[in-house]
Amino acid sequence: LVGSEMCIRDRLYSEGYTAVINTTINSKGSATYNNAVMAAEEFYSVHPEAKGKFTIYNIDGESYSGAYGYAVVQGAMKATKDVPAADIVAFMEDWIKNCVIFFAPYTLKYAKKSGRIPSAAAFVGEVMGLRPIMRIHDHAIVTETKVRGDKAIVPKILDLTVKEMIPQTPYCIVYGNDESVRD
């Protein structure tokens, strides 16, 4: 990873770019962010003349692509409009800092396998029809609440989302492709 990032940064620098913005997955769940920081340090050790001419911004996504993806797309759109890199980074970091994800598994099978839910709790939850509503924010995944039955999931997520929304700011509501549970 570090080597491939070096090649990209070398190429961008040699082509005259003045900045690169790199957004990575949650630094507490992956070493990608720390590797990117090390790659930036290595780039400047190889190219000391680049300091002050070529800025490498590494942004910790603090979550997963479903959360920071919007900021990345918006940042790319801003870049095509010649918005300064520092302003793009400020926008992206603000979005990431304020972004909260709510989701719920329709089966506890995978949550049990991953260790997020103990086996006994998963068994009882399946028998009783309990579904955890999970919250991802600031590097952490926690169980926000539980609902009984699949049909209660979406209304509860919408309720929680409305409570988290900051007025007059963009938001995204995303659902999977199983239309039988969407409706």
List the model feature ranges, each with a label.
Residues 23-27:
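Active-site microenvironments of hydrolase-like enzyme catalytic domains
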Residues 28-32, 36-41, 45, 51-57, ...:
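Mixed-charge interfacial surface used for oligomerization/domain docking
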Residues 9-15:
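Short, well-structured alpha-helical segments in soluble
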Residues 1-8:
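Short, small-residue-biased leader/transition segments that mark boundaries at the very start
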Residues 19-21:
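Structural motif
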